[in-house]
Amino acid sequence: MRIKSNLVGTNIYIKNYELADKLFCTNMWFNKVNGKYLSDPTEEFVDDNYCQAVDDMYNSPNGYYFIITRICDNSRIGSFCAFPDETEQIIDIGYCIHQLYWRQGYATECLKMIIEWAQTQNFTTITAEVAKDNIASCKLLEKFNFKIKKESYLQKISYEHRIQKLYI
């Protein structure tokens, strides 16, 4: 799934993921600090199926894959994904900002833009799964009035997760 045109904010724009973004994304996701709370495998557990899935992200029929880019210098600073459910009323999101750009307001601006985009696409609910220990991400979702829907434990990475929901 792809958007027809970039989503443009004050400091960032969100564009469709392309194969040229693969190395940036995998370096960020596999980084021990940056990828700590992600559900992606660590580099040593990446298999052929995962590699194929990453290769196919740019043209996935099941979800949107985005790159977050700074307007001032065109630097890639993060990734974002969004998966509509079968009713196309609920969209589940995930995001990762490169650690060099943490605590600079980019995730806030990005989430605001994605919420606005989701509203224009007629989604009624946004869900996001976040590690309970990922305080910055939990606070970001709280800032936008996401509410905890349920808590679970993800055995693979040994973190309790919260699935949060926002009705829009």
Task: Label every model-predicted segment.
Residues 56-62:
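Short loop/turn motifs at secondary-structure junctions and domain boundaries
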Residues 33-53:
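Conserved GNAT-fold acetyl-CoA-binding loop/helix
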Residues 1-2, 53-56:
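Short, P/G- and charge-enriched loop/turn segments at secondary-structure junctions
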